[in-house]
């Protein structure tokens, strides 16, 4: 081990920064964040330093560095572009037994500054001992993605509860088991949802009961590309005991679920066995009441034609804790991957999202509004009703030559885009499979320039050739 990682309390300790440029300011800002009394030595300062001095955050000596500037200093950092000055800072600090760091010169460092993941009071430091700083930064980025933002709040609440716990739970091993249960259970989810008073009450409840309480996370998995999954969604998926998922959730996303989680398909798809919504609701409640951490995983966003609101109402009535993690809805994700902007100053000032899967057989659509020009119309689950959609839009005034696109499996490796005109919609839909999104409006033509992902768009004629072949 080349260096011993030590976390140092710098609050109100005098720390010196030599240099007045951008690099020196980054180091000074880090010291300020740790509560240090920062002094800067430099003839000239950048604007950030000048603002900090005006706000009395740092003190400044407008002079060249001298050894006497280290008198009474706890820690020093040299960040100038002059090797002779940096060497003098290092030599002078060593003579006074002052900790010193010369930026980008490990030979002149008695300490080095690691890459930091700050979830105060939880702090994680990553260092390559100065050998590969970029690698250390990449490792830090990966850890940033894995560590939830609410870790610090969890640690603070837990720290304030430790003394109280010691009075009621005297055994060290029992206290350890208590905290393991706390940090892997409902307490964590309450803090993540900003319900800190309930989280504190949960700690009290856990000292009086050993039965775990279940919770549900309603998660949007996005349109298919696992890279579009949110960090929060990934964290919860890897903590789940049970995952109830739809057919629209891609295999890529399902591969990221915790390996030993129970997987339950509750999807609905034409031609396949479908689980009624009422049965899905009952399953979610059942698993949560067993004390399990349940993930309800939906394609796209759960609140955009996903019936997420209905499922949460059932959980509310059953007094079960829940949280919602939004996902990128197909209208945003699939169109972006197809090179179709939803709005454009020249072509569309409005974007409307509607579902083609109507309740029962009633048609409650305001077709006169949907048929307006200068807007983009995005239709979810519209393939089976494509003929009706085409007919109603034409009857209500939308031009037959309005550009349209059907995006099949948007954002996924098998994405296919079929383009044509509104007058061809019903015929085009015969060449597409679910899940598909219908986009209607002049913005579709922009995909000729903006298309960047997957197969090139197919026209009606190309699709017909494929079918004949």
UniProtKB/Swiss-Prot annotation:
Keywords: Cobalamin biosynthesis, Lyase, Methyltransferase, Multifunctional enzyme, NAD, Oxidoreductase, Phosphoprotein, Porphyrin biosynthesis, S-adenosyl-L-methionine, Transferase. It comes from the Bacteria. NAD(+) binds at residues 22-23, 43-44. The modification Phosphoserine is found at residue 128. GO terms for molecular function: NAD binding; precorrin-2 dehydrogenase activity; sirohydrochlorin ferrochelatase activity; uroporphyrin-III C-methyltransferase activity. In the N-terminal section; belongs to the precorrin-2 dehydrogenase / sirohydrochlorin ferrochelatase family. This is Siroheme synthase. It comes from Photobacterium profundum (strain SS9).
């Amino acid at each position: 081990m080349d260096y011993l990682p030590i976390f140092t309390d710098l609050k109100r300790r005098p720390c010196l920064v030599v240099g007045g440029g951008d690099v020196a300011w980054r180091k000074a800002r880090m010291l300020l964040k740790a509560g240090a009394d920062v002094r800067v030595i430099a003839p000239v300062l950048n604007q950030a330093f000048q603002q900090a001095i005006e706000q009395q955050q740092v003190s400044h000596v407008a002079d060249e560095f001298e050894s006497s500037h280290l008198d009474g200093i706890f820690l020093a950092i040299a960040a100038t572009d002059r090797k002779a000055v940096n060497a003098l800072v290092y030599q002078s600090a060593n003579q006074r037994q002052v900790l010193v760091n010369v930026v980008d010169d490990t030979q002149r460092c008695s300490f080095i500054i690691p890459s930091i993941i700050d979830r105060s009071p939880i702090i994680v430091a990553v260092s390559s001992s100065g050998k590969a700083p970029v690698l250390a930064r990449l490792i830090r980025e990966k850890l940033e993605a894995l560590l939830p933002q609410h870790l610090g709040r969890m640690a603070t609440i837990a720290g304030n509860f430790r003394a109280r716990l010691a009075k009621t739970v005297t055994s060290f091993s029992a206290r350890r088991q208590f905290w393991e249960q706390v940090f892997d259970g409902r307490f964590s989810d309450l803090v993540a949802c900003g319900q800190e008073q309930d989280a504190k009450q949960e700690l009290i409840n856990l000292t009086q009961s050993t039965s775990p309480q279940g919770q549900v996370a309603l998660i949007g998995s996005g349109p298919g590309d696992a890279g579009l999954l949110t960090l929060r969604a990934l964290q919860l998926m890897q903590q789940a005991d049970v995952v109830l998922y739809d057919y629209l959730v891609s295999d890529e996303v399902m591969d990221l679920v915790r390996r030993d989680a129970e997987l339950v398909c509750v999807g609905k798809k034409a031609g396949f066995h479908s689980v009624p919504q009422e049965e899905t609701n009952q399953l979610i409640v059942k698993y949560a009441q067993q004390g399990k951490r349940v993930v309800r995983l939906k394609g796209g966003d759960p609140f955009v034609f996903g019936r997420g609101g209905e499922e949460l109402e059932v959980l509310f009535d059953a007094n079960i804790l829940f949280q919602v993690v939004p996902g990128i809805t197909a209208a945003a994700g699939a169109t972006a991957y197809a090179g179709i902007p939803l709005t454009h100053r020249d072509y569309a000032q409005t974007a409307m999202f509607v579902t083609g899967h109507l309740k029962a057989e009633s048609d409650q659509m305001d077709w006169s509004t949907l048929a307006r020009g200068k807007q983009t119309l995005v239709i979810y689950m519209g393939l089976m009703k494509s003929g009706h959609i085409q007919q109603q839009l034409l009857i209500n005034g939308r031009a037959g030559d309005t550009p349209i696109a059907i995006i099949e499996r948007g954002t996924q490796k098998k994405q296919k885009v079929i383009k044509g005109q509104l007058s061809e919609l019903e015929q085009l839909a015969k060449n597409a499979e679910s899940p598909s999104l219908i986009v209607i409006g002049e913005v579709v033509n922009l995909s000729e320039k903006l298309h960047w992902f997957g197969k090139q768009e197919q026209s009606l004629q190309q699709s017909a050739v494929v079918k004949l072949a």
